[in-house]
């Protein structure tokens, strides 16, 4: 694990310990199980692709460790509604506070403002966070292979699937890809950003295409900044995208989405 990932994971364990002291796991799990309003994340993406369109997971993100604040005037509900109007398949909402200036309320606000399925984007290392995700309204979670061993990934996936949530597993290299393929989820994200160096290259996705089984729904993540990037991916039969920074810097994120995928 890179230094930044080690720091983030250590922070997560501290946050979870504090949260558990405030509210027990059983109470949280009961609240999560009581929610029956799961929106179909995978289904929304497959519907876009079946219609010949790009399936865009549009990100609601105020800041990042590498770029700092991306959007000063940050209004999650307005951003979510704009994304929905302009063709997003799903949302991804950052809930990490320390490194991305996110929070659970941002996810709640974004989800309440639209009918799109919502991914809780955070660094998931404990089942407590998965129950927390469903309790706050998330329809899907992200598992980052670089942060987890095989047993942890399988355990967290099982908790999410028990809540009828979708799971997007994120990889960056071939070793992580092979580990991810042992999971049940068909949703596979390839992050074009090296989490050790923060360098971005679309060749990361393109170089692994031949090793991705046809039953997996591949999502390319990071580095999609222009229409030429989109065209390059779609020419390689990659039709699902997770995009954040390019939209967050635009005056109207939804208009930027429509322009990028026109």
From Swiss-Prot:
GO biological process, one term: L-tryptophan biosynthetic process
Catalytically driven reaction(s): 1-(2-carboxyphenylamino)-1-deoxy-D-ribulose 5-phosphate + H(+) = (1S,2R)-1-C-(indol-3-yl)glycerol 3-phosphate + CO2 + H2O
Keywords linked to the UniProt accession: Amino-acid biosynthesis, Aromatic amino acid biosynthesis, Decarboxylase, Lyase, Tryptophan biosynthesis
MF-aspect GO terms: indole-3-glycerol-phosphate synthase activity; phosphoribosylanthranilate isomerase activity
UniProt xrefs under Gene3D superfamilies: Aldolase class I
Pathway: Amino-acid biosynthesis; L-tryptophan biosynthesis; L-tryptophan from chorismate: step 4/5
The enzyme's E.C. designation: 4.1.1.48
Family: Belongs to the TrpC family.
Protein name: Indole-3-glycerol phosphate synthase
